[in-house]
Amino acid sequence: MATKLRKQPIRYDENPFIEGMVVPVKSQRVQLSRLGRDDNILVNQATGEMQGTHVTTYRRVDSEEFVKLFSTNIALTFELGAAGIKAFSVLVWILQDKGISKDLVPLDKFVLEDFLNAQEKKLALSQATFARGLAELEKAKIIAKHVRQGWYFINPNFVFNGDRVAFTTVIERKKTLQKQDESE
């Protein structure tokens, strides 16, 4: 009878989770690292605590998924409503589809009609909802009206005709009032 050899467990001399850990997750790659290095760290001025983790997710997606994810992240960042998200999708579409490389774009009923016709899945977006969405984008300082009606300047800090973008969200836990009172 042959004896089974046990597979030896992998053992480490140093903690493998400390630096540059890459975790493959489905169609993306998640990289974990410390938030800041050397003198570039976050320090709690009250407690002197120095902590933080930086999670970076890399995903390669097709053009349609890119627009969808980009729009969703902008919507979360600027707290856009459904109308704002849809209007932003039209804005990104016209930049990519028409190859506009200027900071002035048309966003009128004709562009809306072209956008709706170009969608594979039927999308419900009326002219009134589109107008409300454009107002949300103006309020968020993503676009600004041009003197010519139906034309808008785009804020190049938020909207671009590129193929790569990184969003960083820092999540900080609030301390409860009770804990703050006890420490004083």
From Swiss-Prot:
Keywords: Plasmid. One of its GO terms (biological process) is plasmid maintenance. It comes from the Bacteria. Pfam families: RepL (PF05732). InterPro entries: Plasmid_replication_RepL. This is 20.9 kDa protein. It comes from Zymomonas mobilis subsp. mobilis (strain ATCC 10988 / DSM 424 / LMG 404 / NCIMB 8938 / NRRL B-806 / ZM1).
